[in-house]
């Protein structure tokens, strides 16, 4: 038998280290799965808390309203940079709204929520050209990029989104977000080598 320390170490190791072959990614993935949605629907139908209270809170947020209007920008700056004013809050708010509306769609099957989320993602995918500025641009690429991907995942079973919007969202991810992740994780940014300036959470974001 393995010593206790080895048993404990094995228990906390990621399961994929022991799994043969390649795991298949299931849609939706990342933060929310179909089993999560199914469980939540049952809890809300049974009027159980905290699910019902949380659902009511979600549906009453201004960032969950199907009438939400996105404000896409061609360039995003997390902080003021040279003669550019910080405007990253536009992306923060819109991506949060896309996720909320996507979640409402998955739980309620209300197509107005799916259309609104799809509209937000389409607006950014057809407008955004760059995430720029200082080093903190990598935080925006990581944090909002991940949230954007989650919003898109929630719409993977909404055919109008899949047919008309998903390709442009994938293109945006491949051309703007993912290259920034690779640049950061590969330590290609000169300032990244200042160990007093950056911490592990920057890499976790990417």
Q: Which residue stretches match the model-derived regions?
A:
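Fungal secretory targeting signals
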Residues: 1-23
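Internal, conserved structured core segments that host functional sites
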Residues: 198-203
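Helical hydrophobic small-molecule/effector-binding pocket
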Residues: 193
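Extracellular glycan-targeting catalytic surfaces
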Residues: 20-189, 197
């Amino acid at each position: 038998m393995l010593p206790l320390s080895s048993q404990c170490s094995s228990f906390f190791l990621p399961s994929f280290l022991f799994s043969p072959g390649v795991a298949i990614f299931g849609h939706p993935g990342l933060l929310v799965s179909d089993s999560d949605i199914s469980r939540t629907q049952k809890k809300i139908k049974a009027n159980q808390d905290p699910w019902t209270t949380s659902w009511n809170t979600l549906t009453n947020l201004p960032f969950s309203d199907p009438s939400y209007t996105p404000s896409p920008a061609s360039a995003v700056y997390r902080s003021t940079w040279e003669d550019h004013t910080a405007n990253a809050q536009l992306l923060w708010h819109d991506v949060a709204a896309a996720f909320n509306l996507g979640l409402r769609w998955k739980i309620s099957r209300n197509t107005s929520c799916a259309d609104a989320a799809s509209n937000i993602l389409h607006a950014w995918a057809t407008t955004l050209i760059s995430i720029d500025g200082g080093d903190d641009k990598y935080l925006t690429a990581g944090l909002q990029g991940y949230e954007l991907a989650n919003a898109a995942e929630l719409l993977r079973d909404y055919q109008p989104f899949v047919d008309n919007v998903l390709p442009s969202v994938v293109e945006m991810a491949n051309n703007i977000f993912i290259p920034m992740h690779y640049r950061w994780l590969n330590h290609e940014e000169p300032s990244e080598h200042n160990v007093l300036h950056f911490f592990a959470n920057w890499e976790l974001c990417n």
